[in-house]
């Protein structure tokens, strides 16, 4: 009898141990996920959209936090949110014309307002506003019809729900800290994520934000990311996961995000030191003007040339550019943003071959420009017009067979030393956004 009890106990411990190993085993992406990663890495250009009831205040997406408005007073804005000029098809047409390959939309930002018909809360655009239309659903349909990949932004934090354990933001909205209930909030999030991944067709990626809200906690906060990531991958194995946490990648993630910075840099100051760059597909998100959400006084839009040069430098780092627009409260995209999209689209129709499907070149971006690679061809993007008529030295890794001006038959003389260093003179040319050389290995 004692022997049987010992054997039963040993079997139980073995089962428990096996379960523990299974739960902590490193994430292994599926074949569908790996294909999705490769497709994503080739896209190079996407559009980010920050839109919610915060657009009505015209002060950016952090208005609730920055103003210290009571959450109940803020929520009254939903009663008047009626974006009658919203047309998902027109949005997607503008993005495709701009050369974008995917769209990332804020389904729910830090203010907690959901932009779809969610059963997990009545604080959403269908139930809490007179608009009564499912924006996520309409955008998803438009994207699928146009063969545009749809990514969904989802905030891990909430400045209005009392069950969310507040971190360093959202402390002046009238929430009662003693009512925090992480288990309840975590269940709420997973219910919403399940809706997003089961109601709107194929989702290219889930883009998380808010991890940084607890980066000052004395005891590290457990976001329980891995179980949530596993749930997403079970629902849609090809769905990529990215998290704007400003840290090294976490187990279960499929892409690495850099906010307002090129990969590996920290000019925006979001991390104490430059985050290590992983071997995952990379994405840089950047605003078209100064804010993510609509801000009426922010008319400091980047020029077409600046956006193109940002795209070039991002591609030169082997990353995608996710360019943000804050739609107006009436549902229209700002006229200046549309103008910039048209300009970028015109450039990409002429030179997209040097961007789409490329990887980083032999040199990282330089003050004069950047290099992208496709097969045995490297595209040298010279964005500094001051180099016209002057010599340029390139540190390359392979022997060069020819150098020509992209899109022409003009061959350029060059010299290459034994250590593969290439020297040539840039032809004189009129001022241009990007003078491109085609270097064949």
What are these regions (language model features)?
Residues 23-441:
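Mature catalytic domains of secreted/periplasmic carbohydrate-active enzymes
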């Amino acid at each position: 009898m004692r022997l049987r009890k010992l054997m039963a106990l040993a079997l139980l411990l073995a089962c428990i141990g096996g379960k523990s190993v299974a739960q902590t085993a490193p994430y292994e992406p599926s074949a569908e996920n790996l294909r999705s990663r490769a497709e994503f890495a080739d896209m190079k250009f996407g559009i980010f959209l920050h839109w919610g009831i915060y657009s009505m205040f015209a002060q950016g997406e952090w208005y609730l936090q920055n103003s210290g408005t009571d959450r109940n007073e803020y929520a009254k804005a939903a009663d008047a949110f009626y974006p009658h000029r919203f047309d998902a098809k027109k949005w997607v047409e503008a993005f495709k014309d701009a050369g974008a390959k995917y769209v990332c939309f804020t389904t729910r930002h830090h203010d907690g307002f959901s932009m779809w018909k969610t059963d997990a809360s009545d604080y959403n655009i269908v139930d809490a506003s007179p608009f009564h239309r499912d924006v996520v659903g309409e955008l998803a349909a438009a994207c699928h019809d146009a063969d545009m990949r749809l990514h969904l932004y989802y905030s891990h934090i909430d400045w209005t729900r009392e069950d969310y354990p507040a971190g360093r933001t959202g402390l002046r909205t009238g929430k009662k800290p003693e009512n925090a209930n992480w288990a309840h909030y975590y269940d709420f999030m997973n219910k919403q994520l399940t809706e997003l991944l089961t109601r709107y067709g194929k989702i290219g990626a889930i883009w998380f934000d808010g991890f940084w809200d607890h980066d000052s906690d004395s005891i590290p906060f457990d976001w329980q990311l891995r179980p949530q990531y596993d749930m997403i991958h079970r629902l849609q194995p090809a769905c990529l996961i990215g998290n704007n946490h400003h840290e090294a990648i976490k187990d279960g993630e499929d892409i690495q995000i850099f906010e307002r910075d090129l990969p590996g840099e920290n000019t925006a100051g979001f991390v104490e030191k430059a985050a290590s760059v992983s071997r995952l597909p990379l994405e840089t998100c950047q605003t078209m003007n100064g804010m993510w959400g609509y801000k009426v006084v922010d008319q400091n839009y980047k020029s077409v040339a600046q956006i193109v040069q940002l795209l070039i430098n991002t591609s030169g780092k082997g990353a995608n550019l996710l360019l943000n627009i804050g739609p107006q409260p009436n549902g229209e995209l700002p006229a200046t943003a549309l103008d910039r999209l048209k300009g970028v689209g015109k450039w990409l129709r002429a030179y997209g071959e040097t961007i789409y499907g490329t990887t980083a070149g032999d040199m990282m971006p330089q003050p004069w420009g950047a290099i992208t690679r496709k097969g045995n061809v490297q595209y040298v993007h010279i964005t500094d017009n001051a180099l016209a008529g002057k010599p340029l030295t390139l540190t390359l890794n392979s022997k060069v067979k020819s150098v020509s001006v992209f899109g022409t038959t003009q061959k350029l003389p060059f010299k290459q030393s034994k250590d593969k260093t290439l020297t040539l003179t840039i032809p004189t040319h009129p001022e241009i956004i990007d003078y491109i050389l085609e270097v064949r290995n």
